[in-house]
Amino acid sequence: MDNLTYEKRLISKAARSHTPINGSFELLPLCNMNCGMCYVRLSRPEMDLQGHLHSAAEWISLARQMQKSGTLFLLLTGGEPLLFPDFKTLYLELRSMGMILTINTNGTLIDETWADFFAQYPPRRINITLYGTSKETYRDLCHYEDGFEKALRGIRLLRERNVDVKINGSLVRSNSTDVDSLVALARSLDAPINIDTYMYPARRERSAAFCEQSRLLPEDAARGKVQFEKASLDSKTYLQMAQTIITRVSETPDTPEPDFQRMRCQAGRTSFTIN
């Protein structure tokens, strides 16, 4: 039985007992990049108007309560979590509690010191989002021209130390032509990749017309998803997947939606987020 199967069994058991096994700490809204589609990021002045960061001690206190309640899997995210003061102190304390840690980061801050730290105290996985495969895309979308080379360097430093890395992508107007090159890059780095095509409305774009937002039109998002599947799967697997979807759609009766459907999402059942 592989680790993923064990995890699914644990989550299934947690759902039956209403155990909060899976948590997420959104440590801060601050980030060294400024992506157009981001719905989390605040500048320091914007954050100060709304509140302040929790201290490492406050997060640790919360984590102890979570540990007693059965939390095992914990995601550390942001903003950019590596900007959080005392990140290493918090990380090591969470690790000592037996929590299985995953980190979401843009990867641009990872240097030899960070890479050595994660090699010595490895997380379950570090998810690094690549927003494109060129400095031009990072300049236009993230307003950080050096971001691509820095993120790429961070991934390589981690992989050289055998730290588990997964590459995530966020498909928007500015990088919609980068799907194939992102998949090829992930292969060259020996890292799995997933590209999300649905973006939440960005706080700064909510008053703009849809055509002026970073998000793709639904039809374009669907095309991007198909393009990603086609680029990342071998032809036989892709055709099997496509046929399965076609069969499922063609055999689904055209009936009205029921008044109530059981919620499949685990939010509030086995998972939660604290910011």
Predicted regions: what is each one?
Residues 48-51, 127, 140, 168:
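Generic anion/oxyanion-binding catalytic loop in active/binding sites
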Residues 131, 136-267, 271:
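Radical SAM enzyme [4Fe-4S]-AdoMet core and its adjacent flexible, acidic
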